[in-house]
């Protein structure tokens, strides 16, 4: 049996500025020790506010924030065992790499030998051994980020907060740094809390994802859970690309949409309950019109390198997005085929607690 330890807990936390609507609205969640968490959502959803509340840069309007079993609402930022890597890295341009990393240790008045040992160890961890005397102005974007991370880990915090640290990097370097950050977190065993609006980053790096919108957590879970079983239309649309249509749950394992009935793997709905149906573009297979479960017309096509992105319209006017390696032409009449497992049925207005309970019932039946 795996024993988990909660390191951070929010209980009914609200953050409001003046008389504006709450930036965070009655948010509760737990962060387990030693995992990589991502706070994911669009601009203004509240993800950076959560980070700043944990760091101590903001104070909650309501609710309690715990570190372990201790309430930290009133503990100042410099007294919390937390370090932050900012979007712009916040390095000191007049200090070299060594002095940037050593800065926090000097504030703590550690002995010179201890500082030297810790700084060199931190730089080894981020693959910057031998860069101690390098000026910050001489470093690339990826190297500067490594310096910022070394400065964070040298203080041996219990939690490292990362506020969109990859956003300024080009695509190739960003992908490399995703791997490096994930590998570093595993080697250190420290809890990482990463903020991003990039869905691919979140899916690639995280043990757990919290999807936020309008100051509320819409869904939390593993990347696979959230991608395969989105709780609502916002999550389905925000995480990857989705085809979403209105439907009706006829009975367990049978759903109706586009005026046809299909076998599915969902259950626990009321007979004839109005629902929303999601099918991912990569789960649709292009066939001949006669063999397809849906008959559509190709409306447009884009080449994306590893696949074609094909936009189609069915006879009812619904738009369908398909990812395929098969080349078609605009105006072609084609069929779309899919397996029952590709259909995901979403209950309107379902809470995360209700959603989790329904998914648990699937496991019990299986």
UniProtKB/Swiss-Prot annotation:
Q: Where in the cell is it found?
A: Cell membrane
Report the SMART domains cross-referenced here.
Answer: AAA (SM00382)
* Residue intervals of the ABC transporter domain: 8-239
Q: How does it sit in the membrane?
A: Peripheral membrane protein
Sequence positions that bind ATP? 41-48
Q: Which reaction does it catalyse?
A: ATP + H2O + polyamine-[polyamine-binding protein]Side 1 = ADP + phosphate + polyamineSide 2 + [polyamine-binding protein]Side 1
Q: Which UniProt keywords apply?
A: ATP-binding, Cell membrane, Membrane, Nucleotide-binding, Translocase, Transport
- Matching InterPro entries, A to Z? AAA+_ATPase (IPR003593), ABC_SmlMolc_Importer (IPR050093), ABC_transporter-like_ATP-bd (IPR003439), ABC_transporter-like_CS (IPR017871), Mo/tungstate-bd_C_term_dom (IPR008995), NA-bd_OB-fold (IPR012340), P-loop_NTPase (IPR027417), PotA_ATP-bd (IPR017879)
Q: What would you give as a GO molecular function for this chain, any one?
A: ATP binding
Question: Record's GO cellular component, any one?
Answer: ATP-binding cassette (ABC) transporter complex
- A Pfam family annotated for this chain is ABC_tran
Which CDD domains does the record associate with it? ABC_PotA_N
UniProt KW rRNA-binding keyword: no
Enzyme Commission code(s) on record: 7.6.2.11
Q: Has the keyword Cell membrane been applied to this entry?
A: yes
Q: What function does this protein fulfil?
A: Part of the ABC transporter complex PotABCD involved in spermidine/putrescine import. Responsible for energy coupling to the transport system.
Which family does the record assign?
A: Belongs to the ABC transporter superfamily. Spermidine/putrescine importer (TC 3.A.1.11.1) family.
Name of the protein in its database record: Spermidine/putrescine import ATP-binding protein PotA
